[in-house]
């Protein structure tokens, strides 16, 4: 990232995490988070400035709470900064799906009154069951879009909003065209972004859907394939061939 920043390239994470939780991914290096798409594009930062923030309608969250309340092993969490608030379901079940969030989670009696930027649904850690819950939510609460980053966990965004929308906000702010953007992805919450951006890249360990959505393909995250690609771009090279 620092090589790209030194070359005058804006680079940052496009993460499902809220903005307050992204720096820990980079060992606390805030320079790597100055430009950022957080909470699945609900928060857009450019050079440390929050240039866009979306929220999820409270009535929609109340409806999701009603749906999940009757589902065994499932629940709704809303975030207050880094704090996960368990609206429905049990912290013990959240721990099975997302241990980091469960560490500091606390149960609350209702959907928060404050504007909610990030909310998730947790389910049993089983891909088929997670997909079943998504189908129920899409039918019962269609004003929200749902994506599947991993079994046991579901992302929520307002209908029609995704990381792709956030990329457009950032590109417009930078005054660049879509073909001047490169995005990397590996899972269900990256699909819209991978389909939308002409130079989209999937890593080798990506889901089949993410690979199919991407224009370019590189090695695995474990081999630092993304870092190598970014370093090459910083040197003025084009590292994508297939």
Predicted region positions:
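Short amphipathic alpha-helical segments
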Residues: 23-27, 49-50, 134, 195-196, ...
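Conserved acidic, metal-coordinating active-site core of Asp-based
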Residues: 67, 71-184, 188-196, 205
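Conserved Rossmann-like nucleotide-cofactor binding loop
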Residues: 19, 189, 208
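Active-site phosphate-binding/coordination module
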Residues: 1-93
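Hydrophobic/aromatic beta-strand patches that form the interior of the parallel beta-sheet core
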Residues: 12, 37, 182-184, 201, ...
């Amino acid at each position: 990232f620092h090589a790209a920043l030194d070359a005058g390239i804006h680079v940052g994470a496009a993460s499902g995490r809220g903005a307050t939780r992204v720096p820990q991914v980079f060992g606390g290096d805030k320079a790597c988070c100055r430009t950022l798409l957080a909470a699945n594009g609900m928060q857009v930062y450019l050079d440390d400035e929050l240039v866009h923030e979306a929220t999820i309608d409270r009535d929609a969250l109340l409806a999701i709470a009603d749906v999940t309340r009757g589902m065994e092993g499932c629940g709704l969490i809303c975030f207050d900064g880094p704090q996960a608030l368990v609206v429905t379901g049990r912290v013990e079940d959240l721990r099975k799906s997302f241990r980091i969030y469960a560490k500091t989670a606390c149960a609350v009696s209702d959907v928060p009154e404050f504007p909610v930027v990030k909310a998730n649904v947790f389910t049993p850690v089983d891909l088929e069951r997670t997909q079943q819950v998504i189908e129920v939510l899409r039918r019962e609460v269609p004003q929200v879009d749902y994506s599947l980053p991993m079994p046991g966990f579901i992302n929520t965004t307002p209908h029609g909003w995704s990381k792709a929308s956030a990329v457009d906000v950032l590109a417009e702010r930078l005054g660049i065209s879509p073909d001047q953007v490169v995005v990397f992805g590996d899972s269900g919450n990256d699909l819209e972004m991978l389909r939308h951006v002409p130079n989209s890249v999937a890593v080798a360990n990506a889901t089949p859907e993410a690979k199919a959505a991407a224009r370019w393909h590189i090695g695995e995250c474990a081999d630092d394939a993304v870092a190598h690609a970014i370093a090459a771009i910083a040197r003025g090279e084009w590292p994508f061939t297939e």
